């Protein structure tokens, strides 16, 4: 029977015990009326405000670390009505590092009652989550002026754990004002000085500073430091305007009104313009003193000196300028060449000298602008020379030239006719026609060729002994010297030596009457066929 009664009472006892333990634990861990702060070094300051009036004579706070073998106790003293405070000194020195960021403290409030000591409250305290540093101290004025002042301070008992997270606030007030009207300055970095500006000269001020560590869950500002009083210097008697912006404003307004006054004077005074012009003109140098020839030539007109010597229409061509005639290049063995030679032989008269004639044209710039591979050459004379099929009689013992044999080489010109330009040496010299044609606009503007009188060649052309050598001779050969000039004959009229003839030996030849060349017309194949219908091709 006793066993049955115990079996149903045991669960009831356990339930009541659990409820009592939960109630006691809630009462112990309730720290809303106990506020403690750690100064990051060796001090924990606590403030206890009991929830109900207690009939006690004294109370203490006991601190125990979960990682260290010491217990610390401080006595609570009343600071105001229903408030008790004390400071737990954890280390032997105020600057000793007694706790770390992983330490936990168990704080208990114990009070003495009539029957003995009773534990009133117990809570767990995280030191680095509840930081409140000591107020800054040692405020001093570093530099002071009439409107500016530099003040510094110091902080102490700050752990190296929180030193990089410090921020400051400073407030300034006039000596006869309250702190509620003070100006607050925030310093978001670890700066232990402040530079005050826009102060009033010869005025007294007070300054206070506080610090906070931006670390942990609960961040609390330190108490304000002791106020430091200072006085600015009196103003200099020369300073008439106390505000800098007012001085700048007056300067700008003065310049503006001065400019308007000058404009009005220049507009209203008519005689001032010529006088000012005369005054400024005296400092301008007269160019006629340095350019006397131009001054006398243009009558002292400077604009005429600088203007163009020709009108603007001079640079715009109004009509098409005459051009040089196109050149006809004929093959010596072609049918057209044979027809031309036959027609010339039929209509020409013998030349007094017995040699062919050549027409010379002065071409200035044609080859420079129209030849793709032309070098930079000066203006020169271009000779257009041909020989209308001269036949020479040779001695009985000598060989006779065939009818289709090439023309003998030309002799160099004499006198002043040899001052033509030397072109780059080439193996393919062209036959140039001296005929003049109508200007062709496809070539662009060019200089009109200047026709010169026909040149007379000396008599006595040596004949070539071998037809093979004649086959190698070009129909038109222009012999040039080493210096680029043509070789000239002697003035006595002697026979000029030809290199080809010197190789074969000189023989006496008789020159047939040479056709008189018409240098003003060069008949084309169509014109020849129109004149002589018996030689149509």
Curated annotation (Swiss-Prot):
Residues 135-235 form the Fibronectin type-III domain. It comes from the Eukaryota. One of its GO terms (biological process) is immunoglobulin mediated immune response. Residues 1-26 form the signal peptide. Glycans are attached at residues 43, 55, 71, 150. Non-covalent dimer of an alpha and a beta subunit. IL2R exists in 3 different forms: a high affinity dimer, an intermediate affinity monomer (beta subunit), and a low affinity monomer (alpha subunit). The high and intermediate affinity forms also associate with a gamma subunit. Interacts with SHB upon interleukin stimulation. This is Interleukin-2 receptor subunit beta.
């Amino acid at each position: 029977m006793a066993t049955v009664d115990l079996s149903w009472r045991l669960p009831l006892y356990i339930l009541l015990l659990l409820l009592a333990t939960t109630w006691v634990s809630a009462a112990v861990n309730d720290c809303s009326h106990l506020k403690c702060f750690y100064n990051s070094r060796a001090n924990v300051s606590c403030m206890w405000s009991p929830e109900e009036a207690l009939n006690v004579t004294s109370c203490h706070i006991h601190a125990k670390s979960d990682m260290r073998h010491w217990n610390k106790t401080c006595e609570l003293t009343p600071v105001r009505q229903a408030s008790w405070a004390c400071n737990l000194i954890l280390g032997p020195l105020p600057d000793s590092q007694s706790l770390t960021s992983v330490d936990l403290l168990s704080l208990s409030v114990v009070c003495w009652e009539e029957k003995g000591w009773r534990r009133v409250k117990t809570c767990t305290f995280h030191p680095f989550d509840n930081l409140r540093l000591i107020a800054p101290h040692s405020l001093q004025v570093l530099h002071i002026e009439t409107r500016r002042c530099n003040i510094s301070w110091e902080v102490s008992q700050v752990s190296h754990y929180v030193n990089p997270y410090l921020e400051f606030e400073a407030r300034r007030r006039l000596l006869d004002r309250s702190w509620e009207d003070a100006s607050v300055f925030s310093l978001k970095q670890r700066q232990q000085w402040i530079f005050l500006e826009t102060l009033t000269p010869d005025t007294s001020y007070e300054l206070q500073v506080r610090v906070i560590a931006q670390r942990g869950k609960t961040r609390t500002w330190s108490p304000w430091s002791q106020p430091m009083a200072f006085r600015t210097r009196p103003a200099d008697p020369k300073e008439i305007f106390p505000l800098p912006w007012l001085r700048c404003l007056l300067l700008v307004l003065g310049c503006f009104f001065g400019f308007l006054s000058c404009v009005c004077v220049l507009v209203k005074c008519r005689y001032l313009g010529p006088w000012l012009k005369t005054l400024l003109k005296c400092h301008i140098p007269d160019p006629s003193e340095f350019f006397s020839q131009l001054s006398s030539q243009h009558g002292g007109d400077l604009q005429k000196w600088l203007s163009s010597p020709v009108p603007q229409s001079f640079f715009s061509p109004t009509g098409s300028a005459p051009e040089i005639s196109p050149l006809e290049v004929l093959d010596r063995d072609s049918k057209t060449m044979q027809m031309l030679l036959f027609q010339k032989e039929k209509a020409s008269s013998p030349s007094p000298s017995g040699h062919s004639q050549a027409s010379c044209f002065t071409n200035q710039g044609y080859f420079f602008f129209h030849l793709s591979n032309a070098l930079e050459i000066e203006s020169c004379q271009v000779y257009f020379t041909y020989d209308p099929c001269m036949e020479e009689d040779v001695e009985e013992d000598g060989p006779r030239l065939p009818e289709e044999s090439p023309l003998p080489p030309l002799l160099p010109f004499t006198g002043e006719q040899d001052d033509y330009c030397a072109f780059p040496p080439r193996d393919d010299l062209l036959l140039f026609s001296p005929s003049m044609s109508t200007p062709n606009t496809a070539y662009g503007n060019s200089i009109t060729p200047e026709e010169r009188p026909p040149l007379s060649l000396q008599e006595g052309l040596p004949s070539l002994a071998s037809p093979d050598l004649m086959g190698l001779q070009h129909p038109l050969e222009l012999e040039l010297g080493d210096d680029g000039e043509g070789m000239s004959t002697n003035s006595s009229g002697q026979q000029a030596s030809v290199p080809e003839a010197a190789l074969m030996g000189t023989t006496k030849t008789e020159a047939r009457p040479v056709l008189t060349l018409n240098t003003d017309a060069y008949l084309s194949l169509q014109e020849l066929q129109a004149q002589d219908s018996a030689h149509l091709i």
